Amino acid sequence: MTRYVLSPAAQADLEDIWRYSVERWSSAQAERYVLAIRDACDDLASGAQAGQDAGDIRDGYRKLRVGSHVLFFRRSGAVIDVVRILHQRMDLASRL
């Protein structure tokens, strides 16, 4: 069974997203948004989502958009390694 793992950078991204969402909207909205991101990671692991090739940004990477954010990940055997979770307006290439 495939599983997903958040890199330390992706975990920090998720915490930043939660914190920003609480400050900007509410803790309830932050929980819903972070849950949507985690659900997308589950979908990647289950095969319900495959994402798109992100080789134009970094070789071997794939991406999946969730709300205003983009999950960057690599598939390695039975593991989906979520590398970063970045806002779509960021300079993505420089942060990977």
Show which residues each predicted segment covers:
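Short amphipathic alpha-helical/adjacent loop interface patches that line ligand
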Residues: 14, 18, 34, 38-41, ...
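Amphipathic, hydrophobic secondary-structure cores in small proteins
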Residues: 21-24, 33-34, 38, 54-61, ...
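Basic/aromatic recognition patch in beta-strand/loop cores that engages polyanionic ligands
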Residues: 49-79
